[in-house]
Structure formats: C-alpha cells, structure tokens
Amino acid sequence: MPTLSMFYGIIIRMYNEKGGKHNVPHIHAEYQGEEAVISLENVLLEGKLPTSKLRLVTAWIEIHKEELYANWTLLSAGEKYFRIDPLK
C-alpha cells in the first residue's frame, strides 16, 4: 500500500480499492498498531486512533484535500501516486 505521508508517528497510506468494501475515496492512518480508515470528507469509516492523533489526521486531510483526491484518481487509474507533505 503506497505511503503518502508520515508525521508525528502516524503513517498515511492509500491504495487502489476498485470494488473494495469502502466505496468512497479514503486514506488509511496507522499509529502504534492501531488503524483508522477515514474518508477524504473526514468521516471515520472503520477502526480507531487515539483522539489527539485522529484530530491531526483530519486537519491534515483538510489541508491536503485536493492532493488526496488527485492521488485517489491516479491510483484508481493504476498510475503512480505522489507523496504529500507532512503536517508541520
């Protein structure tokens, strides 16, 4: 699964899920063995993260929403993704 970004111990990944169980554009955020699936509209679809880390991820999604949608389109077409700047 392509790693788009990493910040504050959080790993953000996205991959092509054509026909997958989540039918909306989303990312996977991992932190210390926990994982959450979050839509690009900031809806928690599955899993969990500590509240403070979830807030960081949702802020990052808002900042980079256009880039995330661009990556979703690229990955859905089987093309190469690009990395996105971490939260600073």
Per-segment meaning from a language model:
Residues 6, 40-42, 46-47, 51, ...:
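Generic structural "secondary-structure junction" signal
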Residues 12, 36, 82:
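A broad, low-specificity signal marking well-ordered, structured residues that form hydrophobic/aromatic
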Residues 15-51:
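A short, structured beta-strand/loop element
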